[in-house]
Amino acid sequence: ILEYSANLDKTLAAEHMVETVHEAAIASGLFPRAGARTRAVRQDCYRVANGNPENAFVHLVARVGRGRSEEELQRAGDHIFAALTKFLDPLYCKRPLAISMEFVEISTWKQNNLRHYLSKDKP
C-alpha cells in the first residue's frame, strides 16, 4: 500500500509508481505474481515535519505472510525501496519529500483463482 500526501497530486504519477513497485516486488522473489496486490492511497489529512504545506511524503507498507527469514525480507526490502526511491528521485530533487517503507507480517484468509488465469496468459 503506497500512501502519499495529497500535495503530490499534480506532480506524482501514482499509476506509474504502483507499476514500478509492483514489478519490483515480484522481481524481488518474495512475492508471487498471483499473490501481489499493489495500490496507492492519497492521504488528505496529514502533517509532515514542521507543517510546511510543501512538505510531502510517500510511505510504502508491504504486508507479507509469516515465515520469511530476516535475510529474505532485507533483500526484498532493499530491492523494492531502491526501485521506489529511483522512481521518486525527480520529485526528491525538487521539493521536501519523506520516503519510507515498512514490512508488516500478517496472517490472512484469502481465495483467488488468479494462478489459473495467469497460466492461460502465457504464450
Regions found by a protein language model. Give the residues of each.
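Short, low-complexity, polybasic intrinsically disordered segments
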Residues: 109-123
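Short edge beta-strands and adjacent turn/loop segments
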Residues: 12, 36-63
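Short aromatic/hydrophobic contact patches that present stacked aromatics
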Residues: 1, 59-61, 100
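Conserved strand-to-helix beginnings and helix N-cap segments that scaffold or border functional pockets
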Residues: 14-15, 73-74, 114
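Mid-chain, well-packed structural core segment of small domains
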Residues: 50-90
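N-terminal, polar/charged subdomain of small-to-medium soluble alpha/beta proteins
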Residues: 1-29, 33-36, 43-44, 66, ...
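A short amphipathic beta-strand at an alpha->beta junction
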Residues: 36-37, 90-108
